């Protein structure tokens, strides 16, 4: 799992496996630290997702940490179904396939001139994790 703040957008990249508890706890600290400056969260995952106990810890976070727009982009049917089934994120979060980046950007309010930077950041985080990254739209 890797994440970085780009402007007011938090970009998160997951590998095909779930984050370890150590990774997840570090991520929760990052969320608390940076969320006052974050308007939206973009998650790209190749199949990894938080575990039930990890989501329970996330759901105990302050409302400002949870109350932001989010988009999950993935080719994983499992991850798409899991996010769609989460009532706590129903109103603010949307799930998109890897062919629907434009929809994710529209949902998050990412401007056209910012999109190439966001996609380059997603690719860099994935490569840093050792992932074989698909060709993302330009």
Provide a role label for each language-model segment.
Residues 1-138:
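Amphipathic, Lys/Arg-enriched alpha-helical "gate/interface" segment within cytosolic domains
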